[in-house]
Amino acid sequence: MEKKANHFSGQLGFVLAAAGSAVGVGNLWRFPYLAAKDGGGLFLIIYLVLVLTFGFTLLTSDIAIGRRTKQSAIGAYEKMRPKWKFLGILTFLVPVLIMTYYAVIGGWITKYAVVYFTGQAQAAAEDSYFTTFITSPVSPVVFALLFMGVTAFIVYNGVQDGIENVSKWMMPVLLVLVVVIAVYSLTLKHTDASGITRTGWQGFLYYLTPNCEGLSVQRFLQILLDAMSQMFFSLSVSMGIMITYGSYVKPDVDLNKAVNQIEIFDTGVAFLAGAMIIPAVYVFSGTEGMGAGPSLMFVSLPKVFAAMGKAGTFVGILFFVTAIFATLSSCISVLESITANCMEIFHAGRRKTVLILSAIYLAASAIIALGYSIFYVEVKLPNGSVGQLLDIMDYISNSVMMPFIALLSTLLIGWIMTPDYVIDEMERNGEHFRRKKLYRVMIRYVAPVMMLVLFLQSTGILS
């Protein structure tokens, strides 16, 4: 396989692109829900500890492997150990599956942004609005194809001219928008029909204060698993994306600083997402108002925006534009990972590869978008939930494949290649790898056990 010609221009371009991949829709619709459900500040403390230990280990491994091998997932694992090429193939299949539905979610968000731009905030707050939209045989497909087209156009233009250029302005704007909405949420105040007055500041304290009431060993372990799964999925590890992005990093870039900056950006945005959503929902709906996933973003929050009056339309616009940026940056990285692997496998050029993949995923996105209408199915998943086409793809890729891949990769690096394979790359230019001892312990002993537990829990084997 030929060495890659594409690369990021420097550390800033890489960090912003990688942070864009890590900052996805999960930061907006899952992190706040888990924080509210799992004891507020208690969840935040556990999450931060995991990011600095467990997340750091997996993120460091993926990026270092990518730069050392100068290959995407399939080529990278084959170069490390030819017999482990199968792990590269498994890793490649994760974004292949995710790409079938990520543009659909991006399309939903784009639809809501249009709704707020056109002054239909009150209509979006109606109970049946979201269900009516996703069960339509036309509208979800149109918006999914639009989102997929924008994603493909950016990837088509390459690493520097496409991905890096977009990330350099989109991620700072996203950060500013999140901060603005979070600050506004703290100023909110509302008195409900029963005469109870709640403020945004009270909601913020509810978010920050560790709630240990009724905490048992079983409850603590559940919070730990929730925080671990959120952190794991948030950092874009074990899906080949960071291996691909790592392969674009120049030799003189300090990976130690880069990993730290990616962690800080992703965790910071997740924290601010909680700060902008939890206080707002608390003010208008109390502690019972937090939903998870699509119900939070497309049902609960529109009701909150409607309750804000005229200001709600403007806040809704800012929020859904923020969500578009978060989803688009992740969608770009998913398609880029697939593109890079296909370019290596078939020795094809970028533009031809992207055009073919675009045709495939335009069709796939349309099918998944119609999974709530024409192609509606209900399948009981092993974790006990009932899912449609989108949920099935998400379950297979996120709950089954990613933890399993992470488990195998920690065993490969920790026991077959040995941790020095990654450590040598982290110290390539004479840099001091400060968390070297922590990395050795995590990659060999702690991470494999944690990934096994997460795999058993996410597949429903361990309740």
Model-found features: residue ranges?
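Membrane-interface "cap" regions at the ends of multi-pass membrane proteins
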Residues: M1-W29, L58-I63, R67-K79, K85-F86, ...
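C-terminal membrane-solvent junction of multi-pass transporters and transport-like membrane proteins
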Residues: L87-L90, F346-S358, D394-M451
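Transmembrane helix-boundary motif of multi-pass solute transporters/channels
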Residues: G10-L48, I241, K257-N260, I264-T267
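Loop-to-transmembrane helix boundary motifs in multi-pass membrane proteins
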Residues: H7, G13-F14, S21, P137-V142, ...
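Membrane-embedded translocation segments of transport machinery
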Residues: E2-F8, L12, K168-L328, I332, ...
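Membrane-water interface regions at transmembrane-helix termini and the short interhelical loops
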Residues: L34-D38, A64, K79-M80, F86-P95, ...
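Helix-loop-helix connectors at the membrane interface of multi-pass transporters/channels
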Residues: M1-E2, G106-T135, G246-D252, K257, ...
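Inter-helical loop and helix-membrane interface segments of multi-pass membrane transporters/permeases
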Residues: E2-A5, L34-D38, Q71-L90, A103-G162, ...
